[in-house]
Each structure stands twice: as structure tokens, then as C-alpha cells.
Amino acid sequence: MSFLVLPPEVNSALMFAGAGSGPTLAAAAAWDGLAAELGQAANSFSSATAALADTAWQGPAATAMAAAAAPYASWLSTAATRALSAAAQAKAAAAVYEAARAATVDPLLVAANRHQLVSLVLSNLFGQNAPAIAATEAAYEQLWAADVAAMVSYHSGASAVAAQLAPWAQAVRALPNPTAPALASGPAALAIPALGIGNTGIGNIFSIGNIGDYNLGNGNTGNANLGSGNTGQANLGSGNTGFFNFGSGNTANTNFGSGNLGNLNLGSGNDGNGNFGLGNIGDGNRGSGNVGSFNFGTANAGSFNVGSANHGSPNVGFANLGNNNLGIANLGNNNLGIANLGNNNIGIGLTGDNMIGIGALNSGIGNLGFGNSGNNNIGLFNSGNNNIGFFNSGDSNFGFFNSGDTNTGFGNAGFTNTGFGNAGSGNFGFGNAGNNNFGFGNSGFENMGVGNSGAYNTGSFNSGTLNTGDLNSGDFNTGWANSGDINTGGFHSGDLNTGFGSPVDQPVMNSGFGNIGTGNSGFNNSGDANSGFQNTNTGAFFIGHSGLLNSGGGQHVGISNSGTGFNTGLFNTGFNNTGIGNSATNAAFTTTSGVANSGDNSSGGFNAGNDQSGFFDG
């Protein structure tokens, strides 16, 4: 495997465990000795030949013998020079190695970082070590980058040294021997052919359509990618934009998962850095659907919360609305207990400040249930208002553990979602950190599919924009694993290609067949900037549709959407709907998600009224 994708534990260990520069310096000394011997032999041979020509060799035969001996003397002199050059290059190679070893991170430092991480994680019972864990991971990324930089420098220096070596075949070819040309051609006969087609670069093996070097896959733009359709370096997966992503559809660097927008995320659909889980917005979150940083749990809106559906910072528990609460459904600050309405209380159901004891079943008004500190709730332990369910700190939710508003489902920190674990808003699905997505694990916006960090895609694992298909890091493509733009087919790193595996930019207006307009890919589209099949862009937006059979204003995503624009999913009309068969107009630029809703700013299903969650509300 390439050093570009190896962690510092491996690169550092390999560099420090090797034989060092000793054998190379010994080889340099041997080459110096050989050069001296060859030089002495050349001088002796020339002297002997000259002496014979002056004494024993006479006549035409002597002239012929001297002419035959001269090339051997010349070859010995050339060989001595070549040996001296090889010695110099061996010394240079040793110097390059020593410089690379000095720049490589000591394995003990890497081990100390990993030991520190394990210690912090094991003692992180209440999330108090989250900042230190994030800092340790950031330091580890720097160690990784330092090792890769050292190895890249080593590779470059060693390649430069090797390029200076003169081939011995030229010297062999000068010998007056009929077998010399055959011997000289030996290395050329052993050269490995380029095992790929349509690549621009070197070392792309069994692959097509790459721009760059050492890619094992197709349609990449960049170097050392193991996968297809990547834009960047050393990605292990497909459709990534960035460096060393392990997964697909990521935008940025060193993500382990899919559809992440940011760095060092472990999971999918995260927007931020150092998250572990699904659909988080922010940094250092452990869990799903959190908005903020260093939360441990689900659907927290704030930072340093431990638990779920907390709205504020830093709370420990569930559905607290405020700051520094320890317990459940407290509305206020610095409370210890359950369903307290106020500040600095210790107890259950207290209304007021600085109280100790047990109050009413519900501290809010108009509630049906128990432990509600908000108003007009039906259920248990709601600190928000107008909720049906339990543990909601937001308003107008149908479900549980929602810290956002007007959600149908559970664990949503965003607004008007139908599903669960969404930190974004207007989603139909789960684990989305972006907005208006149909599917799961999307950190981008208005996608229909899985693991997209880009926008307006119909498909999965796209880090580009407005693609119909999968694993594209480019834009406006119909197909698979394209790192170029406006292509129809697969594995293109160039632009406007139809077919498979081209690194070339074509001088045409559209790719595909039957398209009318400019910037289209796919089949039978009309208008501008569409991807997919039989889409018609008649709106004022320059950007068109992705998917199949969409019509009307621009930027519909999915199948058979119509209306003024920005619908994602299936059979939606109107404006800014996500889901199936919604017809809301959302005149105030709100969002509707779910199934067959006609009301604005609603989630769920079959709601005709505005600002509704759940099902069948008028």
C-alpha cells in the first residue's frame, strides 16, 4: 500500500526500523573502490597496448589490433567514470534518507499520542474530556501529515537521485561485440507497460480516465487515490473531494465514513470536525443529530451537553431548556431535578427560583401528562411548548427527544424534519446535517440519496453538485465516479465527455444525447445545467434539475417534481418541499417535509394546515 495512505504508526515504524543509511554508504565506498580499480585497469591497458604497438606489433595487422583494442580501453575509462558517479549518487541517496528520517515523527511520540487518547476516552464518563480528545486527535492529524510530508520528500529526493544514474547499457552498446545490442536492450524489454487507458499521469494501473499519478481506480483527479471519482489525494473510497478520506462522498480531509463535510469525522453526514456519529453540525460531538460542539448524546442544541434533546449549554440529562441543568425537562438555569420552571431549583415540578421540594405534576400550564415544564404539551417531560410526545425541548413537535421545532420523529435538533437524528432542517430521513435532504447521512443540502456532502444530487456519495448518479466529485454529471464536469457515463476526469474514462475536455455544449441548451448531461433534457433524464428547466434559475422527469423552476432533485423550485424527492409541487407528494407553497421561504402535506412549514403526513407536525392536521 502507498505510504500516502498509511498512518504514522506504520510510516514512522518502517522508517525507524529499517537498516538505515549504513548499507548505502557501504555501497558508495564499494563503488569508489571499483572506480579506482577500473581507472587503474584502463591506464594499464592503454599503456600496454601503446607499448606493443611501438615494439612487437608491426604492419597492417598491428594497426588492426590497435584499432580493436582502443574501444576496450575507452570502455574501461567510461566504466570508471560511471562507477564514480554511482558512488556519488549512493552518497546522495544516503543524505536524502537521513533528511527524511530526521523529518519523520519518532514512533514513541506517536505511541504517546495514542496512549493519551485511550486514557482520555476511558475517563470521559461525562464528556468532560471532549476538548482534550479533539485536541489529541488534531495533534495526531498533524503527526500523520508530518510523516506523509517526510515520505513525499523522501520519494521525490530518491527519484531525483535515481534519475541522475546513467544506464550501463550505453557503455555495453559501445563494445565491438554482436551480442552487446541484445544485452543493452534487456532493461527495455523488462519495462512494465502502462496497464490502463485514457490516463494522464504515471503509475495508474488497471484504470481509466485518471488525471494524476498512482491512482488505483477510475476517473480520479489527483494522486494516489484507491477508488474512483475522487478529487484530491490519497482517498480510499470514491466520490471524495479532499485528502485521505476513508469512505465515499466526503468533502475535506481525513474522514472515516461517508458524506461528511469537514475533517476527522468518524461516521456519516456530519458537518464539522472531529465528530463521531451521524448528522452532527459542529465539532467534537459524540452521537447523532447534535447542533453545537462537544455534545455527548442525541439532538442536543448547544455545547458540552451530556444526554439528549438538551437546548442550551452545558446540561446533563434530557430535554432541558436552559443552561447548567442536571436532570430532565428543566426550563431555566442551574436546576437539579425534574420539570422545574425557573432557576437554581432542587426538586421536581417547582415553579420559581431558588426552591427545594416537590411541586405540581406539571410546572407549565395547559399540559396533559407528567413532568412538563413547558405549556400545552401532551406527554411526558417536555420543556418546550405544544408538543405531543416526551422529552422535547423544542416547540410543536410530534415525537420525542426533539430540541428543534415542528419535527415529526425523534432526536431532531433542526426544524421541520420528518425522521430522526437530523441536525439540519427540512429533511425527510435520518442523520442529515444538511438541509432539505431526502435520505440519510447527507451533510450537503437538497440531495436525494445517501452520504452526499455536495448539493442538488440525485444519487449517493457525491461530493460534487447537481449530479445524477453516484460517487461523483465533479459537477453536473450523469453517471458514476466522475471527477470532471458535465459528463455522461463514468470515470471521466475531463469535462463534457460521453462514454467512459476520458481525461480530455471536449469542445461541445452538452454531453449525452438529445439535450437542448447548454451545460446539460444525460438524455433528452431541455434548458440549462440539467443532469439526468428528460428534465425541463423553464424557471429563472440558471441551475437546472437533477434526476428524472422534473419540470418547472430550477433545482428540483429527484423524480417528477414540478413547481417553482427547490423540491426534493418524488412528485412534489409548489416550493421548497422535501418528501413525497407535498404541495406547500412556503411563500415565506419556510420548508415542508413529509408525505402529502399542503401546509407551509409543516412535517409529517397529510397536513393541510401551516406549522403542523404529525399527521392529518387541518
Swiss-Prot record:
Residues 598-618 are annotated as: Disordered. One of its GO terms (biological process) is response to host immune response. Keywords: Signal. Gene3D superfamilies: PPE superfamily. Residues 1-29 form the signal peptide. Belongs to the mycobacterial PPE family. This is Uncharacterized PPE family protein PPE16. It comes from Mycobacterium tuberculosis (strain ATCC 25618 / H37Rv). The gene is PPE16.
